[in-house]
Amino acid sequence: XNYVPEAQKLFQAHN
């Protein structure tokens, strides 16, 4: 997978 911690960080901020 394409694990992207950066994307997860943005996802949390968006939540």
Curated annotation (Swiss-Prot):
Its main location: mitochondrion. The keyword Oxidoreductase applies. Disulfide bonds: none annotated. Pathway: Energy metabolism; oxidative phosphorylation. It is found in: Mitochondrion inner membrane. One of its GO terms (biological process) is oxidative phosphorylation. It comes from the Eukaryota. One of its GO terms (cellular component) is mitochondrial inner membrane. The modification Blocked amino end (Xaa) is found at X1. GO terms for molecular function: oxidoreductase activity. Keywords: Membrane, Mitochondrion, Mitochondrion inner membrane, Oxidoreductase, Transmembrane, Transmembrane helix. It is a single-pass membrane protein. Component of the cytochrome c oxidase, the last enzyme in the mitochondrial electron transport chain which drives oxidative phosphorylation. The respiratory chain contains 3 multisubunit complexes succinate dehydrogenase (complex II, CII), ubiquinol-cytochrome c oxidoreductase (cytochrome b-c1 complex, complex III, CIII) and cytochrome c oxidase (complex IV, CIV), that cooperate to transfer electrons derived from NADH and succinate to molecular oxygen, creating an electrochemical gradient over the inner membrane that drives transmembrane transport and the ATP synthase. Belongs to the cytochrome c oxidase VIIa family. Component of the cytochrome c oxidase (complex IV, CIV), a multisubunit enzyme composed of 14 subunits. The complex is composed of a catalytic core of 3 subunits MT-CO1, MT-CO2 and MT-CO3, encoded in the mitochondrial DNA, and 11 supernumerary subunits COX4I, COX5A, COX5B, COX6A, COX6B, COX6C, COX7A, COX7B, COX7C, COX8 and NDUFA4, which are encoded in the nuclear genome. This is Cytochrome c oxidase subunit 7A, mitochondrial.
